[in-house]
């Protein structure tokens, strides 16, 4: 059986060796180049493959069409992935005749995602394991071939637990690979209701919160001790790395040093014991940032620790300057939800401008949120000053409702292109990073099954179809921004939302004048008891994305770890939530009829079909489907949407129904005056 292998880490080497022993013909191995600065404590897949005389490659983007075509030419029977760090596209997963299989370091469906060995220790689990499963478009979600349980002991660290998982993986593969080769496997679907997902960990995640229990802190230390960067805290401004520790119960702590409520206080220095939110922690070994590995008591002496001194978070003493984010259009749908997400992270400070503040009123008292009421076409000097002052610029102001494209095409062009071009040029002038909202509309009438940021054609209609003014305005700005990046070094990311929806999307008043998104218009029809108008029968399909999924992806774009989003175009949508507008209406009706406030509103008036020209006006043209490829989002952001459409529809409907002022109807218990 011909196999293509994607592998990294020790488990990758174990997988290669197991395949060779099972008699597979390994056609090629794809791995990663070792990242500079990363502690490489594990064996090399490249060296293992070279020892087998197997071709080995380390492409920067394995999902690029060039690599997909090269793999297609090899015509593999099967694909295996062993700890490969990049999510493989559907184009690759569909190539092998017998499917693709992944070995994951947990007992799926629990601990999907990255760093499962570290996360199970952080969370205090008593067992984990390895799972061999079929690969599908959603990471770690395919049917299970087999699993092997690994017990977690109290003294296990990430390194020792990884060794246990490596042994379990070798045994599991020795059992299952011959069955796959003979095509005799049995598959068990995963129970998604039991699934949990965890993202990648960074060195910063090792910061100790002394308010937690000693048991929880010790779990963190075990999870990130050598060869990982280690758990750490601060004595004043000096970093202290803790490599080993043990829990000290309350009844074993010196009664002269009560620690309840004094989390982070040093109780004694020999041994070095620190109070926690519950119990205390003895530091067995550690080091200062520039020092040597040593015992806890010697570390205390070297750093001048004394009883009752406090260990804690450097950020509470020496505040690193927060990233300043300028959001133009901060009161809009994306703007206000993004503000909420950024304010949950202490690293960000937000400056916002908009013509109103109803949606962001809840943030106005936050000291990290600065708002000015104004218009981007008027407040040019304020905008230029704040572009100079801020680090990341998000110009979210645009006319983005279809009826306006035909009703006010010149106004759409003036605002969406001309005013935003000024902002782009200021970002170039002051060397600021811009995160620009492109749109799924730029793909126009593209006939690809999935719209790909890097390969899909951007096709629009004839000039007399003014409906395309929005699409071409955005597309032209995309091209200008790209050119500024290539010629002037502008740091940018273009993100393309695909039909985001959720609470605070529009207002029902906007729907009353026809200037809203589809779901808001449909909700207005239900609230008022008017017929739901389905343009051209509502057959057009869209992929609807929950606002919380979308905002989490956008937050990661702003975060931009290791600069990986610079110069990139990223679709942000949910290809699994595809539905026609008619299906959206039917889903809304079902949720509406089940809502506890249903009896306050008129009876449903039915669906009626209308022609697009009569609804949107002359010059309108629609598209049959709009489905995103999200391979860039998966690769660059380690992001995948999770919220089902039914949940989003229900939450959006609930939000609007609770904003409607319905006259009170007296019942039998009311007093008649």
From Swiss-Prot:
Lineage, top-rank taxon, reads Bacteria
Q: Which GO terms describe its cellular component?
A: membrane
Q: Specify whether Transferase is a keyword of the entry.
A: yes
Binding locations of NAD(+): 354, 375-376
Site note Transition state stabilizer, residues: 102
For this UniProt record, the keywords arranged alphabetically read as follows: Antibiotic resistance, Lipid A biosynthesis, Lipid biosynthesis, Lipid metabolism, Lipopolysaccharide biosynthesis, Multifunctional enzyme, NAD, Oxidoreductase, Transferase
Instruction: Name the reaction it catalyses.
Output: UDP-alpha-D-glucuronate + NAD(+) = UDP-beta-L-threo-pentopyranos-4-ulose + CO2 + NADH; UDP-4-amino-4-deoxy-beta-L-arabinose + (6R)-10-formyltetrahydrofolate = UDP-4-deoxy-4-formamido-beta-L-arabinose + (6S)-5,6,7,8-tetrahydrofolate + H(+)
Record-annotated residues binding (6R)-10-formyltetrahydrofolate? 114, 136-140
Asked whether the keyword 4Fe-4S is assigned, the reply is: no
> Which segments carry the region annotation Formyltransferase ArnAFT?
1-311
- A GO molecular-function descriptor: UDP-glucuronate dehydrogenase activity
**Assembly:** Homohexamer, formed by a dimer of trimers.
Q: Which NCBIfam families match?
A: PRK06988.1 (NF005414), PRK08125.1 (NF005998), PRK11908.1 (NF008872)
Entry function: Bifunctional enzyme that catalyzes the oxidative decarboxylation of UDP-glucuronic acid (UDP-GlcUA) to UDP-4-keto-arabinose (UDP-Ara4O) and the addition of a formyl group to UDP-4-amino-4-deoxy-L-arabinose (UDP-L-Ara4N) to form UDP-L-4-formamido-arabinose (UDP-L-Ara4FN). The modified arabinose is attached to lipid A and is required for resistance to polymyxin and cationic antimicrobial peptides.
- The entry's protein name is Bifunctional polymyxin resistance protein ArnA
Instruction: Give the organism the record lists.
Output: Pectobacterium atrosepticum (strain SCRI 1043 / ATCC BAA-672)
């Amino acid at each position: 059986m011909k196999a293509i292998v994607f592998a990294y880490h020790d488990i990758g080497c174990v997988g290669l060796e197991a395949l060779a022993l099972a008699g597979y013909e390994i056609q090629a191995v794809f791995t990663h180049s070792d990242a500079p600065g990363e502690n490489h404590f594990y064996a090399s897949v490249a060296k293992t493959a070279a020892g087998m005389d197997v071709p080995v490659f380390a492409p920067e983007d394995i999902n690029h069409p060039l690599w997909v075509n090269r793999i297609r030419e090899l015509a593999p029977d099967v694909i295996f992935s062993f700890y490969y760090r990049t999510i493989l596209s559907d184009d690759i997963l569909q190539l092998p005749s017998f499917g693709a299989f992944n070995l994951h370091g947990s007992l799926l469906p629990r601990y999907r995602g990255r760093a499962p060995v570290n996360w199970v220790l952080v969370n205090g689990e008593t067992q984990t394991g390895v799972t061999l499963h079929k690969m599908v478009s959603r990471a770690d979600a395919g049917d299970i071939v087999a699993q092997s349980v690994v017990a977690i002991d109290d003294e296990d660290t990430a390194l020792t637990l990884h060794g246990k998982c490596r042994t379990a993986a070798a045994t599991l593969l020795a059992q299952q690979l011959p069955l796959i080769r003979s095509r005799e496997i049995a598959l068990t679907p995963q129970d998604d209701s039991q699934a949990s997902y965890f993202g990648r960990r960074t060195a910063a995640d090792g910061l100790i919160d002394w308010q937690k229990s000693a048991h929880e802190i010790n779990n963190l230390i075990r999870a990130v001790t050598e060869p990982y960067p280690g758990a750490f805290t601060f004595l004043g401004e000096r970093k202290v790395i803790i490599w080993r520790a043990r829990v000290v119960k309350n009844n074993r702590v010196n009664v002269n040093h009560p620690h309840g409520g004094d989390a982070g206080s040093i109780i004694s220095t020999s041994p070095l014991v620190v109070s926690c939110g519950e119990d205390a922690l003895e530091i067995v070994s550690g080091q200062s940032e520039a020092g040597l590995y040593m015992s806890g008591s010697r570390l205390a002496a070297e750093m001048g620790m004394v009883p009752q001194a406090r260990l804690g978070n450097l950020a509470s003493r020496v505040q690193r300057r927060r990233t300043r984010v300028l959001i133009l259009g901060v009161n809009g749908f994306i703007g206000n939800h993004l503000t909420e997400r950024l304010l949950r992270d202490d690293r960000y400070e937000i400056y916002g401008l908009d013509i109103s503040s109803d949606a962001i009123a809840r943030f106005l008292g936050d000291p990290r949120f600065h708002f000015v009421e104004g218009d981007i076409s008027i407040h040019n000097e304020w905008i230029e000053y704040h572009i100079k002052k801020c680090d990341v610029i998000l110009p979210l102001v645009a006319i983005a409702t279809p009826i306006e494209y035909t009703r006010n095409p010149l106004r759409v062009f003036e605002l969406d292109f001309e005013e935003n071009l000024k902002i782009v040029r200021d970002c170039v002038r002051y060397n600021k990073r811009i995160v620009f909202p492109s749109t799924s509309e730029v793909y126009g009438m593209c006939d690809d099954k999935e719209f790909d940021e890097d390969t899909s054609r951007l096709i629009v209609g004839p000039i007399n179809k003014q409906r395309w003014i929005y699409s071409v305005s955005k597309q032209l700005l995309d091209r200008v921004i790209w050119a500024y990046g290539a010629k002037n070094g502008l740091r940018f990311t273009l993100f393309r939302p695909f039909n985001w929806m959720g609470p605070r999307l529009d207002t029902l008043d906007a729907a009353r004048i026809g200037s809203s998104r589809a779901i808001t218009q449909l909700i207005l029809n239900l609230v008022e008891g008017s017929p739901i108008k389905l343009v051209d029968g509502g057959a057009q399909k869209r992929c609807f994305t929950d606002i919380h999924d979308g905002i989490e992806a956008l937050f990661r774009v702003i975060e931009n770890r290791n600069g990986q989003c610079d110069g990139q175009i990223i679709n942000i949508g949910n290809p699994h939530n595809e539905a026609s507008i008619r299906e959206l209406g039917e889903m809304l009706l079902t949720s509406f009829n089940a809502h506890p406030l249903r009896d306050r509103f008129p009876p449903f008036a039915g669906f009626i079909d209308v022609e697009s020209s009569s609804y949107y006006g002359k010059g309108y043209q629609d598209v049959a489907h709009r489905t995103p490829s999200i391979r860039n989002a998966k690769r660059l952001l380690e992001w995948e949407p999770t919220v089902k459409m039914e949940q989003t529809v229900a939450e959006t409907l609930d939000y609007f129904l609770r904003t409607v002022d319905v006259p009170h109807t007296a019942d039998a218990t009311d007093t008649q005056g």
